[in-house]
Amino acid sequence: MGDNLEPLEPSLQNLVEQDSLKWIFVGGKGGVGKTTCSSSLAVQLAKVRESVLIISTDPAHNISDAFDQKFTKVPTKVNGFDNLFAMEIDPNAGLNELPEEYFEGENEALRVSKGVMQEMINALPGIDEAMSYAEVMKLVKGMNFSVVVFDTAPTGHTLRLIAFPQVVEKGLGKLLRLKMKVAPMLTQFVSMLGMADVNADTLSQKLDDMLRIITQVNEQFKNPDQTTFVCVCIAEFFSLYETERLVQELTKCGIDVHNIIVNQLLFLQNSHDSCSMCASRYKIQEKYLDQIADLYEDFHVTKLPLLEKEVRGPESIRSFSENLMTPYEPKAKPKE
């Protein structure tokens, strides 16, 4: 391949300008600055899209720290923005842990059926968290955000999250097949509990609705016009190794990936004037940047700087987010 190939634009401008995108996942190894990158991307998207939602699926929930604002399981407007919202979900949570807001607008029978459904779901391992995820996706789709950015947990959890629509499809299909067998018993069970309005058909309808939404999401996740994944790494061996594993797994899952962010880079203007540790780190980073250039010549590779101060608060993120659009250039130090 390649000596004649023009390197691709080293920014995320290609994503921000792709109007058809509905779902953008941002992920990588722990400690590489995923949350700063996903929050910055969401801020840039908010400039050109009608409404943007950033969802943290990392149990550490760093987006509250990044924006210096407490977020919950329900979309909340980010301070300083009119069209940027954030929420935090636990991908391992069960259906009963979802807040009641998720069931607003449902009739009383369906709200009560949440508990009955939980009893049925307990019989199928792994379906509980899948159903919780299904409810979240239903809520998100129902709110019609222009684009949703996922700030994901470290790599292993991320791959599970992306595979979840398929797990849910299988699980809900199983539940619906069980329906005919359990319907008489279920009707008897709910009438004993005094829930006359709840019946097997009500639950079945709820499951059918969920299955339809999840099937739709599953199709969208595999459509590169609607879904893409941004890998975040640092210029070190283990991070690069993890990134390559992630790219291969995503390709296997049929998820589009063509953007890599290399974060926390030293931009030395004169390595001779730098301390020995900085000069040494700079050399190591240059070595891995060369490897990244060889491995990912058909990717957009965005390089972000290691800063003296942490990126925290909406204004700080707004300022840092410009580096996603325009390649970072260090400011020249004034001569003494």
UniProtKB/Swiss-Prot annotation:
GO terms for molecular function: ATP binding; ATP hydrolysis activity; metal ion binding. Pfam families: ArsA_ATPase. It is found in: Cytoplasm; Endoplasmic reticulum. This is ATPase ASNA1 homolog. It comes from the Eukaryota. GO terms for cellular component: GET complex. Disulfide bonds: none annotated. The active site is at D58. Its EC number is 3.6.-.-. Keywords: ATP-binding, Cytoplasm, Endoplasmic reticulum, Hydrolase, Metal-binding, Nucleotide-binding, Transport, Zinc. GO terms for biological process: tail-anchored membrane protein insertion into ER membrane. It comes from Drosophila ananassae. Zn(2+) binds at C275, C278. InterPro entries: Anion-transp_ATPase-like_dom, ATPase_ArsA/GET3, ATPase_ArsA/GET3_euk, P-loop_NTPase. ATP binds at K29, G30, G31, V32, G33, K34, T35, T36, E236, N263. Coiled coil: none annotated. Homodimer. ATPase required for the post-translational delivery of tail-anchored (TA) proteins to the endoplasmic reticulum. Recognizes and selectively binds the transmembrane domain of TA proteins in the cytosol. This complex then targets to the endoplasmic reticulum by membrane-bound receptors, where the tail-anchored protein is released for insertion. This process is regulated by ATP binding and hydrolysis. ATP binding drives the homodimer towards the closed dimer state, facilitating recognition of newly synthesized TA membrane proteins. ATP hydrolysis is required for insertion.
